[in-house]
Design a protein with these regions (language model features):
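Beta-strand/loop-rich accessory regions of lumenal/periplasmic or secreted enzymes
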Residues: 14-332, 337, 376-380, 396-399, ...
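Well-ordered alpha-helical segments within folded domains of soluble proteins
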Residues: 395-413, 461-476, 509-526, 563-582
Length: 603
């Protein structure tokens, strides 16, 4: 069904080999087998065509310039509050079509009664080689014949860094006639809106740490901003960056219409750049000659940005406000007692809270290492593994060992503290993109999770003891993003394949955590899907643990060529996994096996 402007609903209608989406304040079409995200967009002030939107366009450092080919759109969500459509895409290298075809997925989400859309772009290295990205840029042009380049004009004025950490450095533009102005905070915006008249084209870029720093151009003067490692290392940011660091946007406004683009968590996912000029806006998800982005074969990365269409008379502080809210949206809250009554999680809800214990848990969660960068955000370097030399002298990435997102989900459920959900979301998104193999000629890798290694997956291996799903399922439950569910199922399928390999055929030849983690993964997937296929190997693992105990007396692990020892850590993982299986299928023989294993540990 169709909806009228501003009636507070959304609709999606199949039309002309694509879809027409009406959101009340916007309506737009997407077309199958096209080269532009939008076939047409109407904000009821101006109609934009496919020629107003270009990219994202990919270039690599081997000299390839790629053409974007969008496949068939499919409906992900059809209202009443949001409308989402998604399409698989190909980035095809000109002149090298057969050998270079880099896949991508684009999703467009509109909102009831809102004049903005969210764009997610997920690139996947579906080649056998490293993909060294030279640039990845999206353009919105004011007119069909406008030309915007990715070149950045050197500015004599910059926003600078908020090194005080207070956001209180004052600016004075009362005697500045332009053509470029820099101001921090909203105090001077009314004055600068008069100096930079939208009827002569006003250009803006903005970043924030505490107060937002605006660079404003009049008469269509180019303004731009770049975020790189040098920018970040000089800026004092004391926020919980998973929740909020600051914003990063570009705005173009003339006498007819205006649009701003905000890149989500740009600082955390550097390098990034934006520019606004007389012809429109360039959004540089990877700017040229800024940093190094090398995606290994099978690696993916999703990024997102919001396009906000607004009237020429909308105040800059309102545009900034919407941009900031996009960076830190409201999160739902459910009281811990509701989680406890629902029984949807293991019982981590004490009757009486101990302040010292709670402070300790929160400190551990808040004190986790944060590693910035487009391919690093959401993961952390394991200094212990690195010092041991496991990365051959290079940093070893933990790859979310041992299901850090699940721990965050439990912390959110038991406390209701918002930032733990944001920790979950950021780390799970990294996990789904970087730590999982999306392309390989080896079927034992597809869908599986890489063990901690240098370069996230470079020279990596896959074993059952380093594949987890509970945090991904938590992410799916909290966000509704089915990619969490699909990724968890893919990991489960990989575990089933690995369990058929020789490494796992003889009880006791691998340590207890190997099949222990496999059992925990498969049990969680059975609970989620109610599909009996996950139970076949569960029963096999339980039987192996019984044979293991009978053969060795306890769950001993191979150590040296002539030694088998008790490794408490490994055994405890196995116990926890068998316990989870027992809770679903209680049997006295399993209960007694658990008790004997724990007795052996404590003795």
């Amino acid at each position: 069904s169709e909806c009228a402007k501003q009636d507070g609903t959304v609709s999606i209608t199949p039309v002309n080999n694509g879809f027409l989406i009406k959101c009340g304040s916007l309506e737009y079409e997407v077309a199958n087998n096209s080269s532009s995200i939008f076939r047409q967009l109407n904000d009821y002030r101006k109609v934009y065509t496919d020629k107003n939107f270009e990219g994202p366009y990919l270039k690599d450092k081997d000299g390839n310039t790629y053409k974007l080919k969008i496949g068939e759109w499919k409906v992900i969500e059809a209202g009443p509050v949001t409308a989402s459509v998604e399409a698989e895409c190909s980035n095809i290298a000109a002149g090298n079509i057969e050998n270079k075809n880099i896949k991508a997925v684009i999703k467009v989400t509109g909102y009831a009664g809102k004049p903005w859309v969210n764009i997610t772009y997920r690139i996947i290295n579906t080649s056998d080689d490293e993909l060294k990205i030279k640039s990845l840029v999206f353009y919105i042009k004011k007119s069909e014949d406008s030309v915007i380049t990715e070149q950045l004009k050197p500015l004599k004025i910059t926003a600078g860094n908020d090194s005080t950490g207070c956001g209180d450095i004052r600016t004075d533009n009362s005697h500045n006639d332009g053509p470029v102005f820099m101001t921090r905070g909203t105090t001077e915006l009314d004055m600068l809106e008069k100096k930079a008249d939208v009827n002569n084209i006003r250009t803006v870029v903005a970043t924030s740490n505490y107060k937002t720093s605006f660079i404003i151009g009049k008469n269509g003067e180019e303004v731009n901003e770049v975020i790189d490692d040098k920018y970040l290392v000089k800026e004092a940011n004391e926020h919980f960056a998973e929740v909020f660091y600051g914003t990063f946007m570009a705005d173009y406004t003339d006498g007819e219409d205006g649009f701003s683009v905000t890149v989500h968590q740009a600082q955390q996912n550097y390098p990034k750049a934006v520019k606004s000029c007389r012809e429109g806006v360039a959004v540089m998800l990877v700017p040229e000659n800024v940093g190094e982005i090398t995606m290994q074969s099978g690696m993916a990365k999703e990024q997102q940005f919001m396009i906000h269409f607004h009237s020429p008379d909308m105040k800059l502080w309102e545009i900034d406000n919407r941009s900031l809210i996009y960076q830190m949206p409201d999160r739902p809250y459910i009281a811990p007692e509701v989680f406890k009554r629902a029984g949807v999680m293991i019982d981590v809800f004490p009757v009486k809270y101990n302040d010292d214990f709670e402070i300790s848990l929160m400190a551990k969660a808040d004190g986790h290492s944060r590693c910035y960068g487009m391919l690093n955000w959401g993961d952390t370097v394991d200094q212990g593994y690195t010092v041991q030399g496991r990365g051959g002298g290079k940093p070893v990435w933990s790859n979310n060992e041992y299901d850090y997102p699940h721990a965050c989900a439990l912390m959110y459920a038991r406390t209701g503290v918002r930032r733990f959900m944001d920790y979950l979301i950021v780390s799970a998104k990294h996990w789904m993109d970087i730590d999982v193999c999306h392309y390989s000629s080896n079927p034992l890798r597809i869908g599986g999770q890489w063990e901690h290694t240098a370069g996230h997956c470079k020279n990596g291996v896959m074993v059952c003891s380093h594949e987890w799903v509970e945090g991904l399922l938590d992410y799916y439950h909290f966000t509704g993003d089915k990619r969490g569910y699909d990724t968890a199922v893919g990991i489960g399928e990989n575990v089933l394949k690995l369990l058929e390999t020789p490494m796992y055929q003889v009880p006791g030849e691998a340590n207890a955590r190997e099949t222990g983690w496999a059992l925990r993964t498969l049990t969680a997937l059975y609970i989620e899907t109610n599909d009996n296929k996950w139970l076949v190997k569960c029963d096999w693992i339980i039987d192996n643990f019984k044979k293991w105990e009978e053969e060795y007396g306890d769950w001993l692990s191979p150590y040296t060529d002539n030694t088998a020892i008790r490794v408490g850590f490994m055994i405890s993982i196995a116990v926890g996994s068998v316990m989870r299986y027992y809770r679903i299928f209680p049997r006295e023989d399993i209960r007694q096996m658990i008790l004997r294993a724990v007795d052996d540990l404590t003795e």
